[in-house]
Amino acid sequence: MLVLPGLGADDRSTIAIRGFLERLGYQVRGWGRGRNVRAPDADVSAVAAQVAKLREDSGLKVSLIGWSRGGIIAREVARQVPINVRMIITLGSPFAAPGASNVRTIWRLLTGQKYEPPTPERVSRLAQPIPVPSTSIYTRADGVVAWRACVEQEGDERENVEVNTTHIGLGFHAPALWVIADRLAQPPGIWKPFHPGPMMAPWFPRSRRSSQK
């Protein structure tokens, strides 16, 4: 599997996620492309090629985990080469409204360049469901992106899981890591929605609210 960092971050930011998954016995790779500050289309093409090589070498479809902007790239890779992708898991990724964030300020600070917002056509495409199973992990206390922009159109093999942390905390938050592990543990070709169960439900705000109705 492949773990993609957020805007301005590199593989060092995903060490906790990758280390956690390696301890569970998975073969995990960082994206190996330095800081995530390039034009997204270039990254999508490069990661798609990387995914194709990983599948060729292993004979298995590749799961992609993307944090923030990395999740947007991961989803577009799945849209481009779904035959090579097993599932997508995103962490605080504003694919439903990519402009609903502090990205303009962050981009200018990181690159010294003016942020060029995506075209209406691209915004519309990013929000469309992808053709592989997907789980969006989000938090209402994000602080960087608007949480509603991270919410998927729920349907067959598409879901949203709410946790209680910050945008920066998503890659270290135990419940978020547990969701990732739970999703990856499903047998190939079989997908069921995430259910924390009564013991873990208090750690998941959406489940807690549902149980109180």
Task: Kindly give the residue locations of the regions a language model identified.
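Helical cap/lid subdomain of alpha/beta-hydrolase-fold lipid enzymes
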Residues: 79-213
